[in-house]
Amino acid sequence: IQLYNFSDGELRVAFEENIRNEDVFIIQSTNPPSSNVLELLFMLDAARRASANRVIAVVPYFGYARQDRKDEPRVPISARVLLDLMNVVGINRIMAMDLHSPQIQGFINTPFDHLYSSMALFDRLKEFNLNFENGVVLAPDVGSAKISQSYAKRLGVGFALIDKRRPK
């Protein structure tokens, strides 16, 4: 894929080879979101317009997943907006890692695979021969308590929940 910025900062995306009837996996994190979300959308659209057989978005970090509901007046549901845009450009599948809010998978009728990095993380931790005797997995908020408890159980360590409050 060739990415090019015009003098005004506008992005141009082009596939440099024929992808007609090919399965195309586009791997793109959405961090930082301002530029990477547009890059992702343009690459997905370019693949579809180049007659790819299937277009699969692999998004290791799915930005805007925290904005999964209308938690106060006059705010968007940004996760939904991003998935609507991905749907409009025409994708066949989405793969994302460790979603902040797994329920966003229901915002789109496209197959959505939610993958967990914990398997690779646990295997890597074993290589360090760490002593987990006094270890604790900390959950930063109530929303992460369930997954944090499962990590603690798998590692055989304690679990703690932090009371996080944001200033208004």
Set out the residue ranges of the language-model regions.
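PRPP-associated nucleotide enzymes
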Residues: I1-K168
